[in-house]
Regions:
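Structured, helix-rich domain cores that form ligand/interaction pockets
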Residues: 1-284
Length: 284
């Protein structure tokens, strides 16, 4: 009997957030510390580290049953000598938190609300977000088959593709493997404005996640999160602030910490982004 394809789940894989500093007392203390100095907040602590693009960068760390863990990074003061870059239009100063990838595959993401509150921060916007759907079927090869199927109409960046012979720089295929054959396929689909700059527009990437873990990232905790499946393929969308903001405005929703743990919100955002990049219709 043929095995059914399995969907393991939709998850956040990358999360960078921008805040308003509502209560600056604790943040002001952080602006006085030197590299490697620590500031204790009872249930978590901050350690200042070197920063390239920001004046103050702190690791957010905590102790979990005797194990020291990294939650993410707090960043203050963009290093561009432009004061406006560090303030929102409403006058509040900016702060940024980047959440560790490992945390996103655990219940520890719930600590974020507590950390925000202790630092006097209020969420303003999502700076960058990766949402991924993990499943057992080779979704990259499935997408390529659909693109090349002449009996299927492809809609690329919401527009119907009518000339199949026209170059499509929005679509790229990357293969990898060993010296004898190509084993893995990665398909990338981008908005035109994202072709040269990932910081603009949305991007879809389909690839073999199990191979990527084994050959590149080494993030075994992702496989463990799904109970070590034999096959693990990923469909991943990347969004920036403008795309998330447009979705929130169109659906008349307000962003909060709870949006980040709301499966319905994440699923709807993923589906809209995916379908805006590419979708298929069988002719007839």
């Amino acid at each position: 009997m043929k095995k059914m394809n399995k969907i393991y789940g939709l998850n956040i894989d990358m999360l960078r957030l921008c805040y308003e500093i509502k209560e600056p007392n604790n943040i002001n203390i952080l602006r006085t510390r030197e590299i490697d100095e620590e500031v204790d907040f009872l249930y978590f602590y901050l350690r200042r580290i070197e920063g390239k693009h920001f004046k103050f960068v702190y690791e957010i760390r905590y102790n979990d049953l005797g194990i020291d863990k990294l939650f993410g990074e707090l960043r203050l003061g963009i290093n561009d000598d432009k004061e406006d870059s560090n303030f929102h239009s409403n006058g509040y100063a900016k702060a940024w938190i980047s959440v560790s990838n490992r945390v996103l595959y655990s219940d520890e993401i719930y600590y974020l609300d507590f950390i925000e509150d202790n630092l006097g921060l209020e969420l303003h916007n999502i700076t960058a977000l990766d949402l991924c759907l993990d499943l057992s079927c080779d979704v990259a090869r499935m997408i390529r088959r659909l693109i090349r199927n002449k009996n299927v109409t492809t809609f690329l960046n919401t527009k119907e593709v009518k000339n199949r012979n026209e170059d499509r720089p929005e679509i790229t295929y990357i293969t990898s493997g060993n010296m004898n054959k190509d084993k893995y396929l990665t398909v990338s689909i981008k908005q035109k404005k994202a072709i040269k700059d990932k910081g603009k527009g949305t991007t879809l990437t389909a690839y073999n996640k199990k191979a990527e873990i084994a050959n590149s990232s080494g993030k075994k905790y992702i496989e463990e999160f799904y109970n070590n499946p034999g096959k693990l393929h990923r469909l991943e969308v990347h969004l920036n602030n403008d795309e998330v903001k447009e979705y929130l405005n169109r659906t008349k929703q307000e962003l909060s910490f709870y949006s980040l743990i709301d499966n319905r919100f994440l699923n709807d955002l993923f589906d809209q982004t995916l379908n805006s990049l590419i979708r298929f219709e069988y002719k007839g």
